[in-house]
Structures are given as C-alpha cells and as structure tokens.
Amino acid sequence: YTGWLLHGTKGGLAAGIFFVLPSVLILLLLSIIYVTFGDLPWVSALFQGLKPAVVAIVILAMIKIAKKSLVTNYHYIIALLSFIAIYFYNISFPLIILGTIVFALVHHKWINKSNNQSNQNSAINQDEKGYYLTTSSVIPHAGFQLKRLVSQIALFAILWVAPLLLFYSLSSNFSFWQQLSLFFTQAAFVTFGGAYAVLPYVAQQAVENFQWLSSAQMIDGLALGETTPGPLIMVLAFVGFMGGYQAFGSSLLAGSLGLLTTTYYTFLPCFLFIFAGAPIIEKTQHNTHIKHILSFVTAAVTGVILNLTLYFAEAVIFGKTAENLLSINWHEVQWLNVIWIVISVIALYRFKIDMLIWLAVSAIFGLTTYFIA
C-alpha cells in the first residue's frame, strides 16, 4: 500500500513482491529441511523446545490485540461470542465476520447513533511538517475510475485462472490443486486482522477437513514462520508445502509447487485489494461508519485468536487437540511444557527479551532436555 501511494502500480508491485520474496525462498528451504530431517530425534527435540515458546508468543499477540480492540462492553461481548462460535460450535471464520458486520451496522444505526456526534467532526491534530505524504497531499493516481477498476478485476480473473488451466492440463491430480487454490483464495478474502486472525480458520480446514498436516506440524510451521523474515502470513505457505508433499507421496517437488501455489493465491487477492480498493480507501479513510464496523471486526478477531491460542496450547500441553475444554483428559498434562510456556511469557512480556533470541533459547532448551533424557 505504501509503495502504491508513493509510486503507483509499479511501486505497489515492487514493494509487495520484494516484501514477500525473501521469506518465500527461506521458508521453502526450511520446509524441505523439515520434511527431510524432521524425524531425527535431535531435530524433533529442537521443535519440542520451540512449541511452548510459540504458544507464549500467540498468547502475547492476543493480549496486545485485545488491549487495543476491546474498548467498550459491546466489543467484549462480540469477542466472547466469536470465541464461543468458533471453539464450541465450529462456525467458520467468514460467517463470524459476516455476523459481526451485521451487528456493527445495527449497533451504529440504533444503539450508537447518539454517541459523540462531535467525533465525526473532529480530526486528529498532528504536526505533519517534514512528512513526504500528509493528509492534505494530492495523489494523482488515487482518484477512483470505474474503467480502471473493471480492467483490474478482469486482469485479476485472468491471473487467477491461468495457473489452474496449467494444472488441469499437466497434473494427474487436478482436484488437489483446485482445492488448494480455491481455499487459499478464500482465506485471503477473509484475512481481517492479519495472520493470527486467519490461522484458526486455516488450521481448522487444513488439519481437520483436508488433512494436509497434523496439528503438531501446524505448530512447527508457525515456529518456522516466527523465525523467518517477512510477514507471518507466510505460515500458510508451509501449509501448502505440506499439502503437496502429502498428496503426492512425499514428493519434494510437489511440496515446493504447493508452497509457491499457496503463496501466489494468498497474495494475488491482496494486490487486487490494493490496486482496486486503495482509491476507495483514500476517499473513505475518515468515514466513521467504516471505522465503527472495523472496530467490531477487530473485536471478533480477538475471540478467534483466543481460539487459536487454546488450539495450539492443547496440542503442546496435552500432546493432542480436543473438541473443547470439557473433553480434555487433565491427567495427560505435560508439565515441562506448561512451565516453559509460563517462563516464555514472563521473559517476553516482563523482561522484553527479543523474540528471536528467546526462540533460540527455547530451541537450546529442547535439545538440552533431549540429551539429559
């Protein structure tokens, strides 16, 4: 988006591609190493040390988002309802977002209509002297044009269909590639709130429905994503790698193609949103109605991230995931992992230890416990 603001379409393409490309290459290499050497005892021990730290990172991410998004009792209610919906009733993330938007519209029209009319007329007074772009800057390419919008959507459709036609012509298992492409396109369209928001939805579908990987492998993928540069959403690329790897009989080539396909179909809609939607956003960024809706969507995302936290915590603490907290066998608690989760939260939150440094410490902890045992 910043690249588009500064230099138009070329700037947006350059910024987007080079933001993602390094992490794609690194994660591809790490994924190949993971499936090749992951069964070695010492490598497995390394990931065992990382998993509790990853749970701690997700817990802290949830707390950080909750502090910013839960500002009224209504936001707390939406967060609680979204958690109940996805955790106890397996209601899909897109439906939760849709329901939240409907509630936000009703709330804004009937409940919040008398609240702070002055907020609509107030602006944030900020000294913008010295900034390259300010709220008063005139951006020539930011104007909305219907013809340009239609051509961008048409180009997006062509770019979306083209790889599928190649898979249809060349692959013996077209249904897998079709499923992979459709799923991650859909995931991209409902990614409100970043990687942590969409991960529960991806984990639910990829692990339980498609069975591309196990819950333990999903946590390993998150650990790899946390330790590589670039956006955390690249964890989805690891899911695509494991899907291709499993679907084609432990094929590294299919896994690599799965990773690249997942990356393509995850980020292609993002480029469409920027190039087609940015002019609209520029016109509506001060619209209080849209801000009101997005505040409730963020609150719902908090509840979804709580579900993600429990999902990963169950796998790390009990060695498996359960349908809900009521069905957990509390005699299976792995206390060493519980202790390391608590220590990790304290280290990262209280003592502000750098996340990458702590992940390295956690990996060493896993190796140490393995050699001692």
Predicted stretch roles:
Residues 1-228, 235-373:
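Multi-pass membrane proteins that catalyze or facilitate reactions on polyprenyl-/lipid-phosphate substrates
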